[in-house]
């Protein structure tokens, strides 16, 4: 039986779903760059906190990254606007191909579907309920439980321990190259969702078992 570990942010959940608010708050000419830097710093802070053994929940990394971007872009954000941005990040939309993919795969008795996320379980549950996809998941495995962030190998081992699955039967499904490389290096199978042509894998580390462009292609693999 295959056990699928779906990453959340950047795989199921579109982190650029914040653009409409940023268009209003920082201007259309800055919004995309702001959103990109926000995501990059969010991940950077999670990596650094994990390496430094200074764990804080993912929403703290998100908030700290937002503060960095506000300062970096030299924009003025009111307290209400700041709160709106943080709230929106906890209610981001699913990608358009997510529901069809999960609905199809969930019908297969030989596949178990889990989420494996850097986000706290309650935040992921909220996103899944908002996106009407919570019913497809057997459980949500969060790094909060071990206070280490992906791509630390302890996270992938924790997934195996929590789900009782063997490494050879476990598949990470992710749109994030660092996650795919981390899981592949650990020994898991992996599928990289390369949604845009400009995405690249780093020139070292594990390689994905499969590379696809949309989640609609996942159905043919299992």
Features from the language model and the residues they span:
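Substrate-recognition element of Asp-dependent hydrolases with the DxDx(T/V) motif
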Residues: 80-94, 98-130, 137-143
């Amino acid at each position: 039986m295959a056990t699928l570990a779906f990453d959340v942010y950047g795989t199921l959940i579109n982190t650029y779903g914040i653009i409409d608010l940023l268009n209003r708050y920082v201007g259309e000419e800055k919004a995309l760059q702001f959103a990109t830097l926000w995501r990059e710093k969010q991940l950077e802070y999670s990596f650094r906190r994990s390496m430094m053994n200074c764990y804080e929940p993912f929403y703290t990394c998100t908030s700290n990254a937002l503060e960095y971007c506000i300062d970096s872009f030299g924009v003025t954000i009111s307290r209400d606007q700041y709160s709106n941005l943080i709230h929106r990040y906890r209610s981001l939309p699913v990608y358009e191909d997510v529901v069809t993919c999960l609905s199809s795969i969930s019908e297969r008795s030989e596949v178990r579907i889990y989420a494996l996320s850097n986000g706290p379980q309650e935040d992921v549950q909220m996103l899944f309920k908002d996106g009407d996809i919570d019913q497809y998941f057997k459980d949500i495995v969060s790094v909060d439980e071990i206070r280490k962030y992906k791509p630390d190998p302890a996270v992938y081992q924790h997934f195996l321990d929590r789900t009782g699955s063997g490494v050879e039967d476990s598949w990470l499904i992710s749109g994030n190259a660092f996650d795919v490389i981390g899981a592949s290096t650990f020994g898991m199978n992996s599928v990289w969702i390369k949604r845009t042509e400009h995405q690249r894998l780093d020139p070292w580390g594990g390689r994905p078992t499969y590379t696809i462009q949309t989640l609609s292609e996942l159905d043919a693999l299992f």
